[in-house]
Structures are given as C-alpha cells and as structure tokens.
Amino acid sequence: MAHINEIKLRMKSIRETRQITNAMKLISAAKLKKAKKQLEKASPYFEKVRSTMADILLRSGKIENKYFHARDEKTDKKKAYIVITGEKGFAGGYNHNIIKFTEECLKQDKDPLLFVAGNVGRNHFLKNKYNVYMEFDYPVQNPSIYMAREIMEVILDLFDKEVFDELYIIYTHMFSNIKMEPSIIKLLPLELDTLKEKLQINESTEKIVDGCMEYEPDPEYVFNVLVRKYIKGVVYGAFVESFTSEQNSRMTAMDNATANANDMLKKLDLLYNRARQSKITQDITEIVGGAEALK
C-alpha cells in the first residue's frame, strides 16, 4: 500500500509541474508573437532612416561625422560591450550560450567595460569580477524603442566623453525558430564601407529617392541626426531579437518539459496499475487463504 501511495504522490507532483511548464510555454508563445509584431511595426521607420542615409551618401559622397572617426592616437583603446542576456532561467541553453560567447570575446581585451542587460548575465559578470557599469540597469522584458533611445543616449554620452573608444553589442541572432546563435556587431566607431554595405550601396546603385530631394538645413546636418537614430535602431533590433530568441528558447524548453512529464505520467500510470493489480491479487489470495483455514 505504501508503494502505491508513493506513486500517487509522485504523479500528483508531476501533474502540478506539467501545469506550470505548459503555462510558461503559452506565456512565452504570446510574448514571442507580441515582440515580432513590435519589430514589424518599427521596421518601416528604420527602413526610411536607412534609405535616407543611403540617399545622402549617394548624393554627397563623403560625410564628416564624429562617430566615424577611430581614435588612432590611442595605442591602448578601451573597449565596451553591450551584452543582452535574460532576466531569468528556464530558457534552455539561451543564457549559457550568450555568456560563454561573451567570455570568449572578452579574452583578448584588457579590462573591458560591460553594459549588461538582464539579471542572469548581470549577476554572472558581477560574481566573476568583470568591469560592469553599475548605473546601467535596464530590463530586457518587453523591449521598446523608447528604452533603446534611453540606453543609447547614456552610452553615446560616455563615448563622447571618451570613457571608451570602441563599442560592440553582443546579442542572440534569431535565424529561424530552430536556429539561434550569439552574435556580435561593432557599433562605434562606424566604418563607412561597412555602413555602405549594410545600406546596400555600391557603384551601380541608383538614386534611392526619385527626383531632387532637398535636405534642410543641409545633407550633413540631417545625416548627423540620422546616424544616432540608426545606431539606436540597431540596438533596438538586437534587443527585440534577443527577447524573441529567449522566449522561443523558453517555449521550446517548456514544451520539452511538458512532453517529458507526459511520458513520465504514462510510465507511472502503468506502474500504478501494476501495483494496484498486485495489491488486489494479494488481497484475494489472503482472503482465499483465510477462508481455507476456516474450513
């Protein structure tokens, strides 16, 4: 009887856990869908920024901007990294992969400055004595363009003050629902050739804007304004991709956990039925034995 009760208690515990994992899967699926819609809504705006920058570069050629100039006079350049991790676990290998990738990137640098988003990464890097910028504390849940603007206003101000010389962002790039990999992008200083490549500009590129587009007060001023918006757009995109990757990883992990719970329940149900049959057989045998003894 004790064995049967143990199986029943274990089955009850697994059913309760299954309810939790299934609920987490559904929540992650809803968040994933919402994040994708956010990115789709913002895409036309950033596409317009991109096309306008490309048009100015095509018409004006070379543009002078402080975010394009490498600080060559410095031999020992200070590097900074924006690292996007999750707020919590239960997301498969999502956090482990991005932290491991970040540590590999940091091996070649001397005391890099880290802007860590997400409690998992923040706690890890603080625990391991990395140079984490303490005033940078932003949630990664439900990323918004307003948050990306606020983040980059702080970081661009530090770059202008020469607190660091180069800036990179490390995030999880979502190639598809089944393929997600940690990635790194150099944000500052911008490289004109790389930017032209991202803006899809080459020698045969035609004018993106038809007719004679005029920029007030001048193309260079407009370009300088758009550069900051472009950088913020890249950061926003990285936050949304990381968030969708995290939710997708959690949804997959919870789906697997729910499936494993179902498998365990099937096995335990079989064990329970066998134990119950064995108990009934034992009871019948004892009754028959008792009846025979009374004859």
UniProtKB/Swiss-Prot annotation:
Matches recorded under InterPro entries: ATP_synth_F1_ATPase_gsu, ATP_synth_F1_gsu
GO biological process, one term: proton motive force-driven plasma membrane ATP synthesis
GO molecular function terms noted in the UniProt entry: ATP binding; proton-transporting ATP synthase activity, rotational mechanism
Alphabetical keyword list: ATP synthesis, Cell membrane, CF(1), Hydrogen ion transport, Ion transport, Membrane, Transport
Main localization (coarse): membrane
Membrane topology field: Peripheral membrane protein
Pfam families: ATP-synt
Residues in coiled coil: none
Transmembrane segments: none
Any one GO cellular component localisation term in the record: proton-transporting ATP synthase complex
Record localization: Cell membrane
Keyword RNA-binding: no
PANTHER family: ATP SYNTHASE GAMMA CHAIN, ATP SYNTHASE SUBUNIT GAMMA, MITOCHONDRIAL
Role this protein plays: Produces ATP from ADP in the presence of a proton gradient across the membrane. The gamma chain is believed to be important in regulating ATPase activity and the flow of protons through the CF(0) complex.
Family affiliation: Belongs to the ATPase gamma chain family.
Quaternary structure annotation from Swiss-Prot or TrEMBL: F-type ATPases have 2 components, CF(1) - the catalytic core - and CF(0) - the membrane proton channel. CF(1) has five subunits: alpha(3), beta(3), gamma(1), delta(1), epsilon(1). CF(0) has three main subunits: a, b and c.
NCBIfam families for the chain: ATPsyn_F1gamma
Protein's UniProt name: ATP synthase gamma chain
Organism whose genome encodes this protein: Acetivibrio thermocellus (strain ATCC 27405 / DSM 1237 / JCM 9322 / NBRC 103400 / NCIMB 10682 / NRRL B-4536 / VPI 7372)
Name of the gene: atpG
